[in-house]
Design a protein with these regions (language model features):
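N-terminal FAD cofactor-binding segment of flavoenzymes
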Residues: 153, 160-219, 257-269
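Rossmann-like flavin
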Residues: 39-41, 48-51, 55-60, 72, ...
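FAD cofactor-binding and catalytic pocket of flavoenzymes
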Residues: 378-484
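Flexible, low-complexity segments enriched for small/polar residues
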Residues: 1-83, 87
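N-terminal Rossmann-like FAD-binding beta1-loop-alpha1 element of flavoenzymes
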Residues: 130-157
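Extreme N-terminal leader/targeting segments of oxidoreductases
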Residues: 51-131, 150, 190
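Glycine-rich loop(s) and the adjacent beta-strand/alpha-helix scaffold that form part
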Residues: 147-172, 195, 201, 314, ...
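Conserved redox-cofactor binding core of oxidoreductases
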Residues: 82-116, 120, 231-326, 335
Length: 484
């Protein structure tokens, strides 16, 4: 895993202390180094760390536990299969309940500028020219790319991740998290209060999201309009744009619930609380695929790879993958291109005669701008970061739930959405479950309890409570120039 400098420093400090006799004595209560301490003593000191009044000790225990379990269950096929999880590609989507047998949508044959680069890196950067350079192929950049390409502009889309066609996606935790998520699926904040999940591949977050299409609520649109002085968000034009996107994705509320989502709907109805179907961007197909968070092998989920990037390609747009943007090229206050590196070796300059669009996500967009010398003086860059803080709630049933089967997110409870008059509430949804995340987040007191809970995975039900983020954070750069 690639973790932040703060977490590396904390873990390195603790490991260094544990490797000495004195440090081990202070932290563990036994003369070390730690690898000479018996296993029962190690389990006792980790349990004591969890209850420590010292924040650094508690953070260290969480880091050891969560990182170890996440890596173990991500890569150990035997462990994942032992607790009931089917490894690799599944064909559940072909035979959804109460529907005809389904067929995959053939993948579009993209062509990439990478094929035209020198086979061996050159000392001088390679120059690529276009009307508009778009950094990022996710939900923002792809829509802009299609819009501009359809109007006759020459567009180049730069993406730092890789492209994997639907028919070649292995749908394993290891490949999905390593290749399709930002920093291998673990981006901790500097104070370790949150761990961020973000997409990092061709199609961005739309390739690994859960296929849900929720329209912004009325109170949210009102807040955007009035707080930021942007009446567009309350206009009929914005509504038209939202519905245009929904139509292009084939959004429908005619969905098939898996058992976990059915339980959420049932529980809400029995308690008299509001719950509703979450429309899916599945091209009007019964998309019964529980592993779409590691890429959709059926091609039914209509992310940008299946929609706007295809539209852009059909109108002449070009694409450059494995290409990480270092900074924006500025000329007398105007953005004229980007400097980037392909596969960490070949330097390229992509020039945009008409302009540059940086749409690399909430973390990497400000990081690119902060790495641009001419823009560093702008103190607003990186500020006003709002996330979706999530709390996980585990429960278990007597009958199998099989949380990895079926569409991941098809129901939502809005019972707590308006606990505050201004809409600072929460939504309750169902998680796209996989052993690496499930086991890393399990609360337990010892190894026996952990093993017992891990074996109950097929019977588990994990609800997520998503909070609307009121207080803003900030994106900075770490020592390596990455988003922190």
């Amino acid at each position: 895993l690639t973790v932040s400098y703060t977490l590396r420093l904390l873990m390195s400090t603790l490991l260094a202390a544990l490797s000495t006799r004195a440090g081990c004595l202070v932290l563990v209560g036994r003369v070390g180094p730690v690898w000479q301490v018996d296993a029962p003593s190690i389990r006792r000191f980790l349990a004591a760390w969890r209850r420590s009044p010292i924040q650094m000790i508690r953070m260290g225990e969480f880091g050891f536990r969560a990182l170890t379990l996440a890596v173990f269950y991500r890569h150990m096929r035997s462990a994942a299969e032992a607790i009931g999880y089917p490894w690799g590609r599944t064909d559940d989507w072909k035979t959804p309940p109460k529907a005809d047998e389904q067929e995959a949508i053939p993948p579009y044959e993209y062509r990439f500028l990478n094929e035209e680069l020198p086979s061996t890196p050159t000392e001088a950067p390679v120059d690529v020219h276009a009307d508009v350079v778009i950094v990022g192929s996710g939900c923002g950049g792809a829509v802009v790319a299609a819009y501009l390409a359809e109007r006759g502009l020459q567009v180049v889309v730069v993406e730092k991740g890789m492209y994997v066609s639907a028919d070649k996606m292995p749908q394993t935790q290891s490949f999905g998290l390593d290749q399709m998520f930002e920093r291998l699926g673990f981006v901790p904040t500097s104070n370790l209060s949150l761990a961020i999940l973000a997409g990092s591949g061709f199609g961005g977050g739309s390739t690994i999201n859960w296929g849900a299409t929720l329209m912004p609520r009325h109170y949210l649109r009102e807040a955007w309009s009035q707080r930021f002085g942007m009446p567009y968000f309350q206009s009929s034009l914005f509504s038209h744009d939202l519905h245009a996107c929904a139509r292009r994705m084939g959004t429908t509320d005619d969905v098939t619930h898996n058992r976990a989502n059915s339980l959420l709907m049932l529980g809400a109805h029995r308690s008299g609380q509001p719950a509703q179907v979450v429309p899916q961007n599945n091209a009007h197909r019964p998309h019964y695929c529980g592993k779409c968070t590691f890429g959709c092998t059926a091609g039914h989920k209509q992310g940008t790879v299946m929609t706007w990037l295809q539209d852009a390609a059909q109108h002449g747009a070009q694409f450059l993958t494995h290409c990480e943007v270092d900074r924006v090229i500025m000329d007398r206050g105007r953005a004229t291109g980007v400097e980037a590196t392909v596969r960490g070796q070949q330097r390229v300059r992509v020039h945009g005669r008409r302009g540059v669009v940086v749409s690399a996500g909430s973390l990497n967009t400000p990081a690119i701008l902060l790495r641009t010398p001419a823009l560093r003086r702008n103190q607003q860059i990186g500020r006003h970061l709002h996330l979706h803080p999530v709390a996980f709630v585990h429960g278990f049933y007597d009958k199998p739930v099989r949380p990895w089967q079926g569409a991941a997110l098809t129901t939502v409870s809005n019972a707590a959405e308006l606990v505050d008059p201004q809409g600072w509430g929460a939504k309750i949804e169902v998680m796209a479950s996989a052993p690496a995340l499930y086991c890393a987040l399990l609360p337990y007191h010892d190894h026996v309890e952990h093993k017992s809970l891990a074996f109950r995975y097929p019977y588990s039900y994990t609800a997520i409570v998503i909070v609307r983020d009121r207080d803003a954070g900030r994106v900075k750069l770490d020592r390596a120039g990455r988003a922190l």
